[in-house]
Structures are given as C-alpha cells and as structure tokens.
Amino acid sequence: MAKTVSWHIINAKILDVFNLTFETSELWIDHDKIVYRGRRSDLQAQHTFDAQGQYIVPGLIDAHMHIESSLLAPSEFSKLVVPHGITRVIADPHEIASVAGVSGIQYMLEEARQSQLHIHYMLPSSVPATPFEHAGATLHADALKPFYSVPEVNGLAEVMDFPAVFNEDEDMHQKISDSQAAGKHVDGHASGLSREQLAIYRKYGIDTDHESENAQQARDRLNAGFSVFVREGTVERDESAILPAISVANQAHFSFATDDKTANDIQHEGAIDFNVKLAIQSGMSPAMAFTIASYNAATAHRLDNVGALTDGYVADLVIIDSLDDFNIKKVMISGQWYVEPETTVLPLANQSLNFTLTVDDLKLPINDKKPAHVIEIMPHHITTTHLVEDVPSQEGLFVADKTYTKIVVAERYHNLGHGVGIIKGFQMTDGAIASTIAHDSHNIIIAGTNDEDMLLAANKLREIGGGEVVVNNGQITTLPLAIGGLMSEQSYTTVIQENNTLQAAFSKISHLNFDPFLTLSFMALPVIPSLKITDQGLFDFNTFSFINIQD
C-alpha cells in the first residue's frame, strides 16, 4: 500500500547543491520535510503541484543581518522579504539590545514568532560595542547565557571588540566559551584587522566574518579559516569587489549577507535575491550562486538538514521562472506555500529620550590658523577617511558650508553629554537631519548646516519618541520609530511610504545620491575605521583613542 505524503512536485528543474547542477526531477514532501527527490511508485500525495518546467532552488538564507536596519518589526520584515525568496535569516538584535538590554532581545524573539520566516538570532556580543560610547544597556556574559537554551538562538553574534579578545578580557571570553559550550558558534567582525590579527580571532574559535570590502580581504579571511559572508546592503556595497575571490574550488566557504538594508531597498532591488543576481550578472553559474545563497549559509551556521532539496531536508524552496533574470513565482516554507499572514506588530514599552541640548552646546570653537580633523564619508561604505584640512570659521567658531557639515552625537539615556565634530560628503546646502539610529549605542545623531535647525531636529525626536527627522528652514518631516527609536509599529508598506517622503524632503537640502540616514548612523561606530564620533567626542580608530578637533 502506497504511503501518503503532503505534496508531490513534478516537472521541475531542481538544484542539486552537492554537485552544482540542475536536474529534471520530482520532490515528495511530507509536512515540513522533503521525503525524497526523484520518482517513486510507492508514494502518493494529497496534493500535486506541476512546476511546468520551472526551476526550484532552496529557500534563500541571509547569513548576517540586522532586522532593525529595515526599520521594521520582525513580523513586518518577514512579509517584505519572503516574496523575495528569503526563507531564513540569521539576525543579530544588537541594535535593540543596545537600547533595551535583555528585554529588547526577548521582544525580538517574541515578535518573530508571529512570522513564517525562519528567524535565527545570534546573541549580541558587545553591548556596548566599546567603552568609548554610552549605551542604554550593558550585557555581560551572565545575562546572555540563559538565552542559549532558546531554540531560535544560534550562537554569539559578531565579536567586534578585538582588543577585548586580544587582551583576554574575562567577560568577553566567557561569552565566547558559553556559546561554544552550548554547542553554538561565534560570528566575527574583523573590520580593519591584519592577517596576524585574524589569527587571534581564529585561535578562540571565531569562525565567520562579513567585513571584507575587496577580494584580497576575502582571501585573507579564507586563508585564516573563516567562512566569508559576502555583503551587499544599502550602504555596504561590497559584493562586486569580492566576487573575483570566489572559485568553484573555494565556493563552499562563501555565503551572502545584507547586514544592513532598508525596507525601501529591499522592495526595489531585493535582499539575498539581489546578491544572487549580482553574482550571476558577474559571470557566476546560477547553480553556484544559489548554492552560496542557501546551503553554504546553512552550513556556516551549523543548521542541520537545511539548504538543500533532497531527502530529509526542511522543505524550504523557491520556484523561479528562469536562471538569467529570475522572477520568483512561489515560496514554500516548512512544507507550506507562503501566503502573507495577517499580524499586528507587538509593542515595546516606550524608551524615553533623556537628553538636553542648547544652541550653545552645538557651537564648535575653531582656531582658523590650524587645520581640523574631519570625517569624510566613503560612498557605499561604512568606513570613513580621516582628513586633516582647513575648515571654514567665523569669529572663532566652525561654520558649515556646502563641503563641510557639523555633526553631533548626544547621549540619549542619561543625559551624559555630547560630542561635536565636522563631516565631509553630506553635500548639505541647508537644514538638518537627526536620528535615534546611531550604531551601535543609538544615541541622538544630528548633521546640519546651522545650529537652529539642528536643535529643532533633535527636539522633534524627543517629541515623537524616536525616529528620523528632516528640517528645512523650520519645516519638519518625520518618520516615527516607536520601538526603541529603531523600528516602527506600522506595516512595511506604511514605513516604505513614510521613508520615501523623508528622502524626498532630504533631497531638497542635499545632492547626496545614497541613503543619508543609514550612512549617518554608522558615523558613530568607533569599531569601524577610520575616524568616527561618539557622545564622548571624536574617535580615531587607528590609535583607538579620542582626539581633539585640532591638534
């Protein structure tokens, strides 16, 4: 008597990730697992799906990302990405944890359970990221340890405090050992590290990295034994420069990641499906590109029976019409065809903004006989260039112009102070922008051409409880982010519309052709080269110390 299973998919060209080939075959699926790939006379199915010669690939996996960067709660994020073929993400809730601590992690876990998307979490390793900024929380090893028993938790997220690892900081090493003792693994964050420094990370079992910006850096990480996550996000556009490092011989050690990508960019160009398209357009075989986007990511994160279309694997799959400019026709997650669910975003107790700024606080004294240290934006990268240049001043104070913009970071949790600096590359002709998204501690960050609009923007953030603001001659445009000042309680369609309005308002005061808010958010991250600013002042990555505006 034939055994009955849930689904029989016929007439499909199915990706074999083990041989990097497509073969015409069939899939038998029972509940959430693939029972068999191929013909079987002893099986029958409750439902049959005729793929009509279309292609089937495993569900795409984002190997490293932050849901908060989409400005969406997890349940709304899933509604946006699943139609792009994404069936699984490995997320680091570092952003909300920096604001709300343990309760932030608990919120992300609970909110994600409304989603059909598989959301795995890596526990934030560095809250705060460094001692050079004030955060809303401090998470020691003992606070993280209970989470390792949660099924959705997959390990320790990007270890970004290299000095703590190198100097054998007790708490950092306890976090690493706790993850490994629980049978989990540890992600790296090796921005700016030399080959010798990479070896230190590997010594302690840190086994992945997503910070390569070019092929040589990717080869260095590969040679050191890392799994390399090839990043293509909103700001960090690294994939094209890394692709030359990938070959048939080494492809198994590469995966795709977005890291930080806005909802607008996901809607317009895609998520990991965009990584795949870039790879194919660059000459990579579709079979290899889809394997990197699925099975390799699952392997890097030690996800058993995930990422392949054969016996015993979870039935996560995507049906596409062609291999060149592929269009996604259907998505199956755990044996169920995806239909967008009706869900409501869960609230998070309000995180009030506690800061005080005056116009006098924003003034920046400058000696016009000396050059100043200036942060220069690198388009489509989160690294910056450290410049020393003459800057405009008047009556002993810095004055912004079309080249140089003032930047301020104000501590938002305990009103502990602020840092003021100069940034080049925002191309602002008027007004100001401000945000409660400032990696990784998410203090208030403001950039502007005049102190009055900058102060108005900051005060508007307090009024709306966090978010993003554009001010143009007193006219204010806002995108409220009620969840910790990082995520919206609204639907993904509403957030995309509000962000479009915000970007349109910014376009009236700047000629910048890339996302200003995501770019601005990384100007406060001191663990990324080269010159950044925190609530404590101007920070030089190369010396790992604070410096004055002028020597």
From Swiss-Prot:
Disulfide bonds: none
UniProtKB keywords: Hydrolase, Manganese
Keyword Methyltransferase: no
Lineage: superkingdom: Bacteria
EC number of the protein: 3.5.4.2
One Pfam assignment: Amidohydro_1
Cited InterPro entries: Adenine_deam (IPR006679), Adenine_deam_C (IPR026912), Amidohydro-rel (IPR006680), Metal-dep_hydrolase_composite (IPR011059), Metal_Hydrolase (IPR032466)
Needed co-factor(s): Mn(2+)
Coiled coil: none
Catalytic activity from the UniProt record: adenine + H2O + H(+) = hypoxanthine + NH4(+)
Any one GO molecular-function label of the UniProt entry: adenine deaminase activity
GO biological process terms held by the UniProt record: adenine catabolic process
Family: Belongs to the metallo-dependent hydrolases superfamily. Adenine deaminase family.
NCBIfam families: ade (TIGR01178)
Protein name per its UniProtKB record: Adenine deaminase
Organism: Leuconostoc citreum (strain KM20)
Gene: ade
